[in-house]
């Protein structure tokens, strides 16, 4: 059976259980029981999540994202991570993941779009900034062999009703579309097939609001 790791922020927390259930019987799917937040946090804690989860060295694929926290503007300040820092830390994470999971294919997902007008005044994200940081990440990963899963392109045209708030897609259609895209790239890269998940009666992971963190 294949082994898959999902690392990422609260966007990942919206589809992780969906992916896990869809791959039941063909792949073991693991992920941290928390929001991985900004890129530096992934660099700092990836090895601890591996150890605590007992994921082992035989992982076949890692799908990860980090960026929405990096672009976050608190109280009108600049993004939490500068562009230069983000450009330097993304390839460091890539190298760390390859060290921790030497047999794994590495997939990076771009950060998803937001509804800017629904962001709180002191807690803002801008799609133009997200686009810039996504481009920085993709450029920084060139030549590494990392596969890009463009979730920004997938979500940028989504109807507002697919969103659960300014940032998240915790709706049936949002989960189905984003989870479906993640599943499709995982299945393509590992040569496996997912089973259909019916949203009626589906139960996502029960993360608390504090754990999601936004």
Region spans (language model):
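Alpha/beta-hydrolase-fold catalytic nucleophile elbow
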Residues: 65, 109-110
């Amino acid at each position: 059976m294949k082994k898959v790791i999902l690392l990422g922020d609260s966007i990942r927390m919206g589809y992780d259980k969906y992916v896990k259930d869809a791959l039941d019987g063909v792949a073991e799917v693991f992920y941290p029981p928390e929001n991985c937040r900004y890129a530096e946090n992934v660099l700092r804690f990836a090895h601890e999540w591996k150890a605590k989860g007992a994921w082992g060295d035989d992982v076949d694929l890692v799908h990860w994202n980090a960026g929405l926290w990096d672009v976050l503007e608190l109280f009108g300040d600049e993004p939490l991570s500068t562009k230069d820092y983000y450009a330097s830390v993304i390839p460091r994470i890539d190298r760390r993941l390859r060290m921790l999971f030497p047999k794994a294919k590495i997939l990076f997902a771009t950060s998803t779009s937001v509804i800017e007008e629904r962001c709180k005044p002191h807690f803002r994200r801008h799609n133009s900034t997200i686009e810039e940081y996504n481009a920085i990440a993709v450029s920084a990963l060139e030549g590494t062999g990392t596969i890009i899963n463009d979730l920004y392109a997938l979500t940028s045209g989504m109807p507002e009703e697919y969103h659960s708030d300014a940032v998240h897609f915790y709706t049936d259609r949002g989960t189905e579309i984003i989870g479906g895209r993640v599943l499709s790239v995982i299945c393509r890269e590992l040569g496996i097939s997912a089973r259909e998940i019916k949203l009626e009666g589906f139960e996502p992971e029960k993360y608390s609001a504090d754990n999601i963190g936004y």
